[in-house]
Amino acid sequence: MKKINEKTVYDGKWLGVRETLYQTREGKELSWECVFRKRSTVGVVIVARLMPSKRFILIKQYRPAIDGYIIALPAGLGFNDPDHALVELKEETGYAGKIVDVSPVLKSGASLIDDNARIVYIEVDEALPANQNPVQELEDAEDIQVLLVEPENAKKFLLDQISKGNHIAANLWYMFGINQLIA
């Protein structure tokens, strides 16, 4: 594949759409539309676990793009520094933790958007006073509920959420829905 030309066909406040003209291996021209982010560089997706109970911290968040709620991992945009995952976790869930592992920069949804993200694994000590009664620090535009899920019940929990009309993030289904089948 060889890029021939690229033009912006929509230029919004946060997102844009590009049309890119490619030449295929066979020499044919192919047009592709892609969404791009205008202000963010690398986001974080947070896998947070309460210790010692080993429950996962998930969120239920309203998303206008789907006009509904999605069960997902806490996440944030525009942070090159993985340490910002701690700030994002505190804002979205009220919990404070420590970073245990950070992935390299990964792509998410490369067929449609140019998103980059790191997966940040955080452990949250349930015994700390700050984690006894966590208080979220949400922005006005955020509608987020915190969900604590035991790993052994996670798949059933996700299926129950679907039956209630909520959506499930694909990365959660990978973690809890099929991971046991491929482990």
Segments and roles (model prediction):
Residues 16-20, 42-44, 69, 116-120, ...:
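Short beta-strand micro-motifs in enzyme catalytic cores
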Residues 35-47, 52-87, 111, 129-140, ...:
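Conserved Nudix-box catalytic region and its N-terminal flanking loop in Nudix hydrolases
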